[in-house]
From Swiss-Prot:
Native organism taxonomy: Eukaryota, Fungi, Dikarya, Ascomycota, Pezizomycotina
Binding annotation for FAD: 41, 54, 302, 315
UniProt keyword annotations, A-Z: FAD, Flavoprotein, Glycoprotein, Membrane, Monooxygenase, Oxidoreductase, Transmembrane, Transmembrane helix
Single GO term (MF): FAD binding
Membrane topology listed for this record: Single-pass membrane protein
Disulfide bond positions: none
Name of the gene: ntnJ
Localization per record: Membrane
Name of the protein described by the UniProt record: FAD-dependent monooxygenase ntnJ
Pathway the protein takes part in: Secondary metabolite biosynthesis; terpenoid biosynthesis
Amino acid sequence: MSNKHSACQVQFRVIVVGAGIGGLSAAVALANRGHSVLVLESTTKLSHVGAGVALPPTTRKWYESEGVLRAESGCIPLDGIELRKWDTGELVTRTAANPIGKQNAIHHGDMQQALLARAAQLDNISIRLGARVMDIDIDSNTVLLHNGEQVEGDVIIAADGVKSVIKPKICPPGASKAQSTGEAAYRFTLARDLLKDDEELLDLVQRSWATRWDGPSRHVVAYPVRNHQLLNVVLIHPDDGNTEESWTTVADKQDVIEHYQDWNLTLNKLIHLAPTQVPNFRMFLYPPSPVWVKGSTILLGDACHAMLPYLGQGVGQAADDAVAIATVLSTIEHREQLPLALQAYEVSRKSRVEQIQAATYQAREHLHLKDREAQAARDLQRKSASESNQNSDVVKMQHSYWVWDAAKVAQIALTELITG
């Protein structure tokens, strides 16, 4: 094993449940600092499917420092975002990247593959597929697998998503109860070759810009991923209520066409190029987890703070969780300080992500105005803000999240707990 990070002073055996982006991020960060990591993933094959995800500039920088992101990872720094009227497609404003750094776009599968590739370079990470966790004994730090096998560690990280098996063992009953937002998202990607014969559509995938159309009860965003070889398209729309609480169902393309038939021509051209079957994700609001830590078991990522997509904070906040837990576990000098380290992890992360969860939910109201006069006033405000070099409230809020130093905050929390 070789890495440039400071080695931990106490080595822990860490079990990570879940090989999604959050779990793998924590695994790589901990292994880079000398801990022994076992990742347990219930699926028998990691298929690297999905759509585009956003990486804030600080998150991308951290992944690069951990040896995860390379040129071939297909991550695109975006020069900015164009906001257009939903019905005519007329340009409202172009907001260039903030001086802090650029928002980045990457395909979910490419991000996961980059993490797996880095994990394969580290001899203190082991990943077991088809290892479905059925139960956990917090007192003995043991997880029970579907085949009856018991696996013991010093620390257990539950990164097993919104339907976490472990979360009910940590939180009181009802803590995971989801509330429908009344909205869902169609997601699809279009290959560059499909767009090459239409100059307007080709421009969407060639340029390093995101485009967003905000309309009544809906909005759509499109941006390039995979080194400009794919255009990622996400269409938020009212939920018909027929989708169960699950990751996805499949809709007919005709359903998508009907939802946006009154929208601008550019968007409708994109929709007509979509696959005949389009994934449809129902979006739920999950209440803040009252507890993140119990014994030596912690929650991470969607297991404790599932994010709605309106501010593009899902991956960034999961990565900050990974930063925080790697920092505190690698700083303590004695095993007896482990409870304080885990407490510092929760203290440094919980209130922050709760604020972001609330802000994300509120942001959708700004995007989905139904009244045309309200839309016009919003668009005028956006245009004026752009012309005076002042970002809109939503963009300013988003950028404020990018200057956060999760490692520093976790370190401060740990120091305060140790010194009393």
